[in-house]
Every structure is written in structure tokens, then in C-alpha cells.
Amino acid sequence: MPKTTKNPADYILPLYMNGLAGRMLRIAPPKNNQREVLFIYGHHASLERYFGVADLMSRYGGLSVPDLPGFGGMDPFYKIGEKPTLDNFADYLASFIKLRYKNKRFVVAGYSLGVVIITRMLQKYPELTKKVDMVISIGGFSHRSDFSFSRQRYWIYRLGLAFFSYRLPAALYKHIVLRPMYIRYIYRHMFNAQQKFKGKSGGELKRTIEMEVDLWRSNDPRTYMATGHMMITLDLPSLGHVGLPIYHAGVVGDHYFHNIKVEQHLRQIYADFHYGKIKSLTHAPSIVATAEDAAMFLPKEFIRVMKKLG
């Protein structure tokens, strides 16, 4: 089957929320299908990076993907005098849902950090669970001990992220380190980048590197660092229960997370847990451009459940 050649720009609309300007991806539902699907992307992301996942999910309902403050080129919380805390992201998502869906029901899916934000939103706004038909986690997590880093690497990340989340260090990082030349020729050899670029060569490697350049230049570095620190100190199980089942797709051999610990912690939060496998070389590829590229991230058993929804 040939890959689709849809252009993300054809589906992107302006988004203005709580004094912040960003974008939203909207794909109309298939014919005779009134189901709605909300997708929340992960850390270090944009609408373009995960367009393939959005395109795939749009086969099962009308698809909406809002930018997150500080990511994808959207204004950061700092612009309105707020910080990118998990509760602020949860409040933002709840506001979007109330405005977008009103009396409609919907499926909500998240990728990595997106699952964290969805979970906190459902904990904080339990009344919204009545509108949710299904919660899907793709490479999601809920607790700091889910990370598989060595103790030394964990503390390097934790202290480094905390330091660069301050205004001056973040500004220096943006204007000195995040230059396109650095990203193209030095960043590609670092630990995290090597995981993303594994198995890529030639034109595919070049496209992946250019996507990384776009991501680092469009995302707010201070927000990136602050949310990274939030993730690496996370403890969602202590913040409440969610009275819904979660359908979690875990990456086999994920270089970031212990899948068993991820399951244990999600079971503590959600009413039930259903597991599906993702066979991927990395936790999150730099580009998921088409529905065909994204097919491995949505297990067939999850698709069957979605198709049975009213």
C-alpha cells in the first residue's frame, strides 16, 4: 500500500486559549462516523512531528490535536505570568475539552507526556470522566521510578533540568547551544539523539535531523526543561484515582522506561488496565509522518475496542 501524502498544513487551524496563541490540528470524521478523538502529543513535539498518529486516529473519528503551551510554537505559560506546572497543563486541557466538546463524548489518547497530562486532568476534574469513552496511552507513564536510567544519569538529568529551567540559563541554552549547526553536527552524537536516530541512514537520517532542528527551534527551551524536571520527579499515583480503564501500548525494549513498573503504577491509578505491545526501535521516533508510519503505535486490539464504541 502506498503511503499517504497528506499535508499537515491543510488541517491546521489557529488556537487561542487562556491568553495564549497556538495551533490546532483538526481532521473531520469519516463519513457516517460521529465519534470524536482527542490526541495529546508528548515532550519535545509539534503537530507536524506526530501528524501520522493523528492521521491514523482520524480513521476512527473526528480528530483534534491542540498544541501545548510552550511546544509546537505555542506561547509558553511564562507569557501570562504562569509556570508550566502539571496542574496548569491539566487546567489548560480541561478548558479545551469544555470548549471543544461541550455535550459530546470522546476518546482521549496521549503519547508519553501527553498521558501524564491526561491522567492529571482526569484526577483533577473527575466530572469529565463521564464524557470519556476510552483512554489510550502510547508509551505513557505516571511515576519517576518508571524511568530506566541509571542512578547517576537520573541525577545528572534531574539537576541539569532544574538548572536550565531558570530564565537566564534557559536563555543562554537557547541562544548559544540551540544553534542549527550544533544540532546538526553535535547533538546527533549525544545519548538521547543516538536512540532517536538508531537504524536511520541517508535521506531518512537527514529528514530526522532537520525535524530535530525545527523542534528545538520552535519549542520553548525553558518549558522543555521545566516539564522534563516535572516528569523526572513525577508521582501521579499519590494524586488520586481515575474511574476509567486505560488501554496502554508499551514499547518493547523501551530505552526510557521499565514497562513492568509503568504497568504497576498505571494500575494504581486507573480502574482497569489493558496492555498492547509496540515493536519499535525507539520510545518516540523524531518523525511519524504518515498513518502507515504510525500503525505500529496503535495495537489492533485497541482498534477493535474503538470500533465497538457507540
Regions found by a protein language model. Give the residues of each.
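Active-site loop/oxyanion-hole signature of alpha/beta-hydrolase fold enzymes
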Residues: L68-Y111, L128
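Gly/Ala-rich beta-loop-alpha elbow adjacent to hydrolase catalytic centers
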Residues: G110-I118
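Conserved serine/cysteine hydrolase catalytic core
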Residues: D214-E263
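Flexible "cap/lid" loop of the alpha/beta hydrolase fold
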Residues: K130-L172
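Active-site signature of alpha/beta-hydrolase-fold catalytic machinery across serine-
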Residues: G52, R120-K124
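Conserved HGGG/HGGXW glycine-rich cap/lid loop of the alpha/beta-hydrolase fold
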Residues: R23-P76
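Alpha/beta-hydrolase fold catalytic core
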Residues: M1-V37, S58-G61, Y101-K102, A289, ...
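Catalytic active-site module of serine/aspartate enzymes centered on a nucleophile-bearing elbow/loop
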Residues: I269-G310
